């Protein structure tokens, strides 16, 4: 089971009075994140973005396909707390919500195995598990092992090419512990 926990990685920022939506993709350092910006055309290097009274960022780089690099006004644990306080759950496009979603999304868009913060999208295959289902599977002899795969926002992107091998995949971070590897290797 994937034990990743989804971050509140959807941020609404303001450049002057103009609104820009950001989806955090990948942390580059203690205070720097790669993110999708919409609309990205307003995010040139040097652009100041205000997310809240306590959270600001500067666009330090801009890439293709709406990706930008943000340097935040705080770092480390303070940045994590500010993102958690300011951000919303990054729901996939097929889940329609008013801007910002609702409080229930914070709970319902996590799997019951969610533990290690880092995903910017839920491992949707695990969303249907409930404690009751897990208990029934354990009673039937199933064995559970945990891996961590921090699902990235690339999972939201459509395939826009005719030839599948031309599609650019985004990277994701994963970890399989020695204990989990041994349990998988021992399974029949």
Regions from the language model: what does each represent?
Residues 1-188:
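Surface-exposed, charge/polar-rich loops and edge strands
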